[in-house]
Regions:
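Beta-strand/beta-sandwich contexts
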Residues: 20-50, 106-109
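Conserved, mostly hydrophobic/aromatic
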Residues: 128, 174, 184, 205, ...
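Active-site clefts of carbohydrate-active enzymes
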Residues: 438-460
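Carbohydrate-interacting/catalytic domains
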Residues: 97-100, 105-124, 175, 487-626
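Immunoglobulin-like IPT/TIG beta-sandwich domains and homologous Ig-like subdomains
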Residues: 36-97
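Substrate-binding/active-site clefts of carbohydrate-active enzymes
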Residues: 133-180, 184-329, 334, 353-363, ...
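Bacterial Sec-dependent N-terminal signal peptides
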Residues: 1-25
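Active-site-proximal helices and loops of the catalytic beta/alpha 8
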Residues: 222, 240, 249, 327-329, ...
Length: 626
């Protein structure tokens, strides 16, 4: 009898354990009331949670639907929060007789969506890589359980230890330089072996990587940046996640990823058999706008994986795109970011991304998002901008990246401007295509970034760099700088990307000099910093540059001229695109000069005659204000 009682007790104990409801995580961890879109998706994770029923008695909250996915460990709960007030809601998860009560906070919004102002062409974005900029907290460099565990500054492709605290401590540096917004590469958790320092393989969409800091530190950085008049732009990736994301080991549904078949066979099949099922993107983006594109070409571009360590998310799955949309909203509300830069924008499903952009625009009409649209061809780039007249669909993406300008300015920098289309003729032709853009002032231009060679290559000649900066900061664009340009940082990608992502001097213990201060910079670094800072501060609040009309002249006698005009004020950027002395023939530009007789060169404070021709030294640039 005792054995029977003991056996029954063990059976009841096992049944109780099996019936227990486990809720390990809910994404998002909290939400906000008062949103225009009152629907909320909760992704609940816990062992065998799929079978649970969910209820709540919080005033006004309605459960619209419960979605049971393929994995037994996920449950999607869709709530309607219309008219709901802030507070702590109790969610009841019931499986048989077992009940798990989970508290869930519904917060009040700090601002109305209309009050969140994004970046515009009045801003200059400063792009940096947190791991390579400054180490403000060495204690978070090596964290057990994070891959890779150790930092190693001697290796260009490993983590070096920079973090959010390092950025926060140098906010005054950005103010001194004269930039107005900071875009840094992704800071969310990248718990992956290999080059996790760059941040483009997310393993947790709701957590700052602890080697960069915490969510609270991100908020502190943003608040202090705002107090100093600086905006923060967050880098996001919807196209793919990191291979170590929990979704990969326990996929919520069979269609959560694009072309996931090879994952199922890795344990049972040979490497050759697995490789035959793996589909990598072709990196050819033309099928996304080609009216004659074949289905296979489009599939290979959009559904193929970027690399094997970055699983391709299926945004056509409505639950996937809803998760991603909510994640972006959560960061806007939680941290207070002023903009988003979306990585690999055209590689994701176009209709899903348009839905995201429409949702963001409806919730935050003055917010801005820039998409990475990497093709050096203006018609392609223009097709991706909101309200494009040359595209088959509306992307609703306000800002695109001008990779054509990047390519042409790097081709032109050492060429002689002649009658064959070389040199500054390339820049002239780039802006000819502005007729294709619905809004040229909302196109982001740059001369270098973290994925390209440095403009200087392996040299340090400033003549071409100054010309490029003068053009970049005076044309009808949103300008973006890359960290270190102001101190002549150089490098190429010939060996590895790490050589164009070097540590900022003075940002790390043991650095041989500190480029954050005038006293720590070399004479050459100081000269470039001072020159660029002068130009950046002049640009701030300059309506001629941000609101003015633009006129350009076909290069003549090697000289390229761009003119801006607003309310009777004029700015002319004059570029000698040759390696010889030439003449700025003022009569050719009479339609802009009018009756003005002299101008001030913003770069030197020198007075320049507008009635007599001016000799221009080789590679000379002037910014004339009159």
């Amino acid at each position: 009898m005792k054995r029977i009682i003991l056996s029954l007790s063990l059976i009841l104990c096992v049944m109780t354990i099996r019936a227990a409801v486990k809720v390990d995580r809910i994404d998002p961890a909290n939400w906000f009331v008062g949103m225009k879109n009152t629907s909320l998706q909760l992704m609940v994770y816990g062992e065998n949670i799929r079978q649970a029923d969910v209820t709540t008695d919080y005033d006004g909250v309605k459960i619209d639907s419960i979605v049971r996915l393929d994995s037994p460990n996920y449950l999607l709960v869709y709530l309607n929060l219309e008219g709901v007030k802030p507070g702590e809601m109790t969610l009841n998860f019931k499986n048989g007789k077992a009940v798990k009560k989970v508290k869930y906070e519904l917060k009040a919004r700090e601002k109305r969506g209309e009050e969140r102002m994004g970046f515009t062409n009045a801003d200059v974005l400063y792009m940096l890589m947190p791991d390579r900029f400054a180490d403000g907290n060495p204690d978070n460099n090596d964290i057990k359980g994070m891959n890779p565990y150790k930092t190693d500054r001697s290796q260009p492709s490993l983590r070096h230890g920079g973090d959010l605290e390092g950025i926060r401590r140098h906010l005054d540096y950005f103010k001194e330089l004269g930039v107005t917004a900071l875009w840094f590469t992704p800071v969310l958790e990248n718990n992956s072996p290999g080059g996790s320092y760059h941040g483009y393989a997310t393993t947790d969409y709701y957590r700052v990587d602890p080697r960069f800091g915490t969510n609270d530190e991100y908020r502190r950085l943003t608040d202090e940046a705002h107090a100093k008049g600086l905006k923060i732009v967050m880098d996001m990736i919807f196209n793919h996640c990191g291979f170590e994301h929990p979704w990969i080991k326990d996929m919520p549904s069979k269609d959560w990823l694009n072309t996931p078949e090879w994952l199922y066979d890795r344990k049972d099949k040979t490497k050759a058999e697995v490789n035959r099922k793996y589909m990598q993107t072709t990196y050819k983006l033309t099928p996304t706008v080609d009216p004659y594109a074949s289905a296979i070409d489009l599939k290979e571009t959009v559904d193929g994986w970027f690399v094997p360590s970055m699983p391709d998310l299926n945004q056509r799955n409505p639950h996937v795109i809803r998760y991603l949309i909510q994640n972006s909203i959560w960061w806007i509300e939680t941290v207070g970011i002023d903009g988003i830069r979306m990585d690999t924008y055209p590689y994701a499903d176009a209709d899903a991304m348009a839905l995201w952009m429409k949702t963001i625009d409806e919730e935050y009409p003055n917010f801005n998002v820039v998409g990475e649209t990497w093709v050096s061809d203006p018609p392609y780039t223009a097709a991706w901008q909101k309200d494009s007249k040359i595209s088959q669909r509306n992307s609703y993406l306000k800002t695109v990246m001008d990779f054509s300008f990047h390519a042409k300015i790097n081709q032109a920098k050492y060429e002689n401007t002649d009658g064959s289309g070389n040199g500054m003729n390339r820049i002239y032709e780039n802006f000819v295509y502005d007729y294709l853009y619905p809004n040229p002032s909302s196109v982001m231009a740059f001369v270098e970034n973290h994925d390209t060679d440095r403009f200087l290559g392996n040299g340090r000649d400033t003549t071409a760099l100054k010309q490029a900066m003068a053009i970049l900061l005076t044309v009808k664009r949103i300008p973006q700088l890359y960290y270190g340009t102001e101190i002549l940082m150089n490098g190429t990608k010939e060996k590895t990307d790490g050589y164009v992502r070097k540590d900022f001097p003075g940002g790390f213990p043991g650095d041989d000099h500190n480029a954050f201060t005038a006293g720590g910079r070399t004479p050459e670094e100081n000269a470039m910093f001072t020159w660029l800072s002068r130009l950046l501060h002049w640009r701030q609040g300059n309506d001629v540059i941000t609101k003015g009309s633009q006129t350009q002249f076909i290069p003549y006698n090697g000289v390229y001229v761009i003119a801006r005009r607003y309310n009777g004020k004029n700015v002319m950027t004059v570029v000698n695109g040759t390696g010889r002395t030439t003449v700025f023939a003022v009569k050719r530009y009479a339609e802009v000069i009018g009756h003005n007789t002299e101008a001030k060169d913003v770069l030197t404070d020198r007075t320049v005659s507008l009635t007599d021709d001016t000799q221009l030294e080789p590679r000379k640039v002037m910014i004339l204000e009159f």
